[in-house]
Swiss-Prot record:
Transmembrane segments: none annotated. Binds 1 [4Fe-4S] cluster. It is found in: Cell membrane. PANTHER family: NADH DEHYDROGENASE (PTHR11995), NADH-QUINONE OXIDOREDUCTASE SUBUNIT B 2 (PTHR11995:SF33). One of its GO terms (biological process) is aerobic respiration. Belongs to the complex I 20 kDa subunit family. This is NADH-quinone oxidoreductase subunit B 2. NDH-1 shuttles electrons from NADH, via FMN and iron-sulfur (Fe-S) centers, to quinones in the respiratory chain. The immediate electron acceptor for the enzyme in this species is believed to be ubiquinone. Couples the redox reaction to proton translocation (for every two electrons transferred, four hydrogen ions are translocated across the cytoplasmic membrane), and thus conserves the redox energy in a proton gradient. It comes from Herpetosiphon aurantiacus (strain ATCC 23779 / DSM 785 / 114-95). HAMAP family: NDH1_NuoB (MF_01356). It comes from the Bacteria. [4Fe-4S] cluster binds at C41, C42, C107, C137. Its EC number is 7.1.1.-. One of its GO terms (cellular component) is plasma membrane.
Length: 250
C-alpha cells in the first residue's frame, strides 16, 4: 500500500497529515486583515468589494482595521501625494510582521494621470515594498479580489526557514525611513539632497518586493536618477502673466 493511499485511508478516519509550514500558512492566508488606506477614487471600488455583491469576507478579509497594529495588509488605493507619503510609511512601520502591501490602481502604482504633477509620487513602492500591483483606473472590485487571491498564493509557498521576519533577521529592514516633506519636496533619510523634488523625477529606485526575496533594500537593477534636475515649476508670485505667455510662445 502506498503512502498516499495510507494517508487517504487515515483521513477518512479523521487523522489528518500536514506540515508546520502548511498549517502556519493556512492560518495566515485565511485571515488577512486589511487596513483601509483610501486616498482617492479607487477607495470606492475597495469599499464595493466589501459589500454583499462581492463579499470579501469569503476570503477572511472582511475586518477592515483602522489601526495598523491589527492589520496584515495595507491596501493603498488612490493617488499618493507627497504630503501623504510620511503617513503611509509611518503606518506601515507600525504594522506587525508579517505585513504586506497591495498597490491598487494606476495612481498608487505609478502616479497615474497625475504622475507629472508637482505633488504626486510616481509609485508608492518608492517608499514601501509592494507585494501585489493592481492595474486599472480604477480597478473593479473583482480585480481587488484577484489581488487578494494572488497574495494568498504567495503566502501558501512561504517557508518559516526563509521568510524575512522569522529566525535570523540579519540584514532585514524592519523600519523604513520616514520622508520629510520640505519646501523643495520629499527628503528621505540616507539619500543626499531632495530625493523626490517638487515637479521633478525621484532620484531613487523602488524597493524590492518581499515576494521576490527582498529584505527591504532598493532594487539595484534600476539605476537611480542621480543628478536629475527637477523640472521648472511656476511658483505663485514669482512670474508675471507676460512671462508665462512669452514662455508658451517660445
Amino acid at each position: 500500500m502506498s503512502d498516499l493511499q495510507t494517508q487517504m485511508d487515515l483521513e477518512q478516519q479523521g487523522v489528518l497529515f500536514t506540515t508546520i509550514n502548511k498549517l502556519y500558512n493556512w492560518g495566515r492566508r485565511s485571515s488577512v486583515w486589511p487596513m483601509q488606506f483610501g486616498l482617492a477614487c479607487c477607495a470606492i471600488e475597495m469599499i464595493a468589494a466589501a459589500a454583499s455583491r462581492y463579499d470579501i469576507s469569503r476570503f477572511g478579509s472582511e475586518l477592515f482595521r483602522a489601526s495598523p497594529r491589527q492589520a496584515d495588509v495595507m491596501i493603498v488605493a488612490g493617488t499618493v501625494t507627497k504630503k501623504m507619503v510620511p503617513q503611509v510609511v509611518r503606518l506601515f512601520n507600525q504594522m506587525p510582521e508579517p505585513r504586506y502591501v497591495i498597490s491598487m490602481g494606476a495612481c498608487a502604482t505609478s502616479g497615474g494621470p497625475f504622475r507629472d504633477g508637482y505633488n504626486v509620487v510616481r509609485g508608492v513602492d518608492l517608499y514601501v515594498p509592494v507585494d501585489v500591483y493592481i492595474p486599472g483606473c480604477p480597478p473593479r472590485p473583482e480585480a481587488l479580489l484577484h489581488a487578494l487571491m494572488t497574495l494568498q498564493a504567495q503566502i501558501d509557498v512561504q517557508s518559516l526557514q526563509q521568510v524575512r521576519w522569522y529566525g535570523d533577521d540579519e540584514g532585514v529592514v524592519n523600519e523604513f525611513p520616514v520622508p520629510i516633506f520640505g519646501a523643495e519636496g520629499l527628503e528621505v533619510p540616507g539619500i543626499p539632497g531632495t530625493a523626490d523634488p517638487v515637479g521633478g523625477t525621484p532620484k531613487m529606485p523602488p524597493f524590492v518586493s518581499p515576494a521576490l526575496g527582498g529584505k527591504g533594500e532598493r532594487d539595484a537593477s534600476i539605476k537611480a536618477l542621480e543628478g536629475n534636475q527637477p523640472k521648472p515649476m511656476l511658483r505663485a508670485g514669482t512670474v508675471t502673466i507676460e512671462e508665462v505667455a512669452h514662455g508658451i510662445a517660445g
